[in-house]
Amino acid sequence: MCTGKCARFVGLSLIPLSLVCIVANALLLVPNGQTTWTKDHLSLQVWLMAGFVGGGLMVLCPGISAVRAGGKGCCGAGCCGNRCRMLRSVFCSAIGLLGAIYCLSVSGTGLRIGPQCLMNGSWDYHFQDTAGSYLLNRTQWNLCVEPPDVVLWNVTLFSLLVAASCLEILLCGVQLVNASIGVLCGDCRKKQGSSQ
């Protein structure tokens, strides 16, 4: 596969993943679809905006850059086999890789610690000391009185962020290697076009 075609495929995969992360993080801000608890009772991992910033915006840029690097075109005055766009894609992919790692680490921590909720009359991270074992014991989830169903909400959305960021790490890594090859060797489409 040409570096250009690979870049386009990776970019078209990264863009929807970044949008999924942005939407998931936005939903984490409104537990159970209500804004009643948004001001004072959201967990730190929600406020760190890992899905919006890390898995979202920091991955959206390399996605767009990879799509552009996969397109035909010249940069500057003469054609350079798309090497300039590939070079930009190398840097963007490195930034996207860091963003996806940030999203993975914050979301994984959010899953391990659990949500901040009202239990036994106090707002706290009641599952923090369980080291994530609450994830397997669904009977504990109902112990949180407010926000209603917050554990299910957080587990679902943080799991989605973890899965999306793992895919983003993989795709950004592939694009980092692919774009580096594209910078060094150029795009093979020019060679294919001349042989036909």
From Swiss-Prot:
One of its GO terms (molecular function) is arginine binding. Residues 1-9, 67-89, 178-196 are cytoplasmic. It is a multi-pass membrane protein. The chain crosses the membrane at residues 10-30, 46-66, 90-110, 157-177. It is found in: Lysosome membrane; Cell membrane. It comes from the Eukaryota. One of its GO terms (biological process) is regulation of G1/S transition of mitotic cell cycle. This is Transmembrane 4 L6 family member 5. It comes from Bos taurus.
